[in-house]
Amino acid sequence: MFIFGNKASKIAKCAQKGNGNPVVKLIKDPDMTVRLAAIDCMGATRCHAASNDLINMLQDPNADVRAHVAGALAGIGDVHAKAHIANAASVEKDAKVKEAMVKAMAKLKDF
């Protein structure tokens, strides 16, 4: 997909342009730095194309991924994600992730 530059710089450029669509597939990248940046980009650009994948990622084994996903879903403003975040929060054991999920649900009240 990317011929020039690294993935992180491409994500930053997409975020700057307000279009996360070109980097949606990077939310599943094996490099955690790339993955988290792509997840954050989805929220920053309100990329609805990533919503379903992000909802599924609320169950990711990595706590940082789950926390970033909650924030991204809130940034996207997908009100349908609120129930999924609430369900994930009800069983979440990591305090940092649970806090991110609670903040995400509060932010989604504004949509």
Model-derived features with residue positions:
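Amphipathic alpha-helical scaffolding segments comprising HEAT/armadillo-like alpha-solenoid repeats
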Residues: 14-28, 47-59, 78-90, 111
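Core register positions within helices of long alpha-helical scaffolds
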Residues: 10-13, 41, 72-75, 79, ...
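Fold-core signature of tandem repeat domains
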Residues: 27, 34, 42, 58, ...
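Alpha-helical scaffold domains
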Residues: 1-4, 11-17, 44
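Conserved hydrophobic register position within alpha-solenoid helical repeats
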Residues: 7-10, 38, 69, 101
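Short inter-helical turns and helix N-cap capping residues of alpha-solenoid HEAT/ARM repeat scaffolds
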Residues: 30-31, 61-62, 93-94
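Eukaryotic acidic, Ser/Thr-rich intrinsically disordered low-complexity regions
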Residues: 90, 95-111
